[in-house]
Each structure stands twice: as C-alpha cells, then as structure tokens.
A protein has these predicted regions:
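Acetyl-CoA-dependent GNAT
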Residues: 1-36, 41, 93-97
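Short coil/turn motifs at secondary-structure junctions
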Residues: 28, 43, 76-78
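Residue-level detector of conserved, well-ordered beta-strand and adjacent loop positions
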Residues: 36, 72, 103
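Conserved acetyl-CoA-binding loop-helix of GNAT-fold acetyltransferases
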Residues: 40, 46-59, 85
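Conserved GNAT acetyl-CoA-binding A-motif
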Residues: 61-74
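Conserved beta-strand-loop-alpha-helix junction that forms the acyl-donor binding cleft
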Residues: 71-80, 95-99
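Conserved acetyl-CoA-binding loop of GNAT-fold acetyltransferases
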Residues: 84-93
C-alpha cells in the first residue's frame, strides 16, 4: 500500500501486476471524510478489493476520530446498491440528479 499526501487530501493506492485501486480521502471538517474516485478495475472485481478499500477508509476515519464517511455515486449503477449493502444510506440527490450523496455513520 502506498500513501501520498496531496494538497486536497490523501491518496491511497495499491498496484498489482494487472490491476490497481485508488482511494482519495478529503476531510474539510472534524466529523466527516469524503471519498472520491474509488475505483477497482473491471477484471479485478469480485476479489474483495472494494471491501478492502472501505476497510481502509473506515480505518483512516477512525484514526482521525471522524464518525461519518460520505461519497457520491451514480444512482443508476450497481455500485449504489453495493454501497447500501456495506452500510451506506442515501443522503440526498446531487444537483445533477444522476448522482446520490450517501453516508455511513461509524460505530
């Protein structure tokens, strides 16, 4: 796992020979982190990488004493249901109504 600090947040990424994932974390207040550009390449799906990304996000949130994770995803995509399965709730439609803001409150 490599970690890179950027001007706007932190980037975590992992490279395998044929695929990779990246997770961008932004924290602009003391109680919420925002995930952006969470990606697992198509051929890597079904191998638990998405679960690992969410574990990393939750670990990083807890490390910062943050209790809420928010993200935005395409509402018509399978990934919307996948996030719900992993404890995220619909929060509100984005200005562009194709996207839904979602949140997960950590224990």
């Amino acid at each position: 796992m490599k970690e890179e600090i950027t001007e706007f947040g932190e980037v975590f990424y992992y490279d395998y020979p044929n695929y990779h994932f990246a997770l961008y974390i932004y924290n602009d207040d003391d109680e919420t982190i925002y995930l952006s550009n969470v990606k697992v390449n198509g051929e890597a799906r079904g191998n638990g990488f998405g679960n690992k990304i969410l574990e990393i996000a939750e670990r990083e949130a807890r490390k910062r004493n943050v209790s809420i994770i928010c993200l935005k995803c395409l509402i018509t995509s399978w990934v919307h249901d996948w996030y719900k399965k992993h404890g995220f709730e619909d929060l509100s439609l984005d200005v562009d109504e194709d996207y839904m803001w979602m949140k997960k409150e950590l224990d």
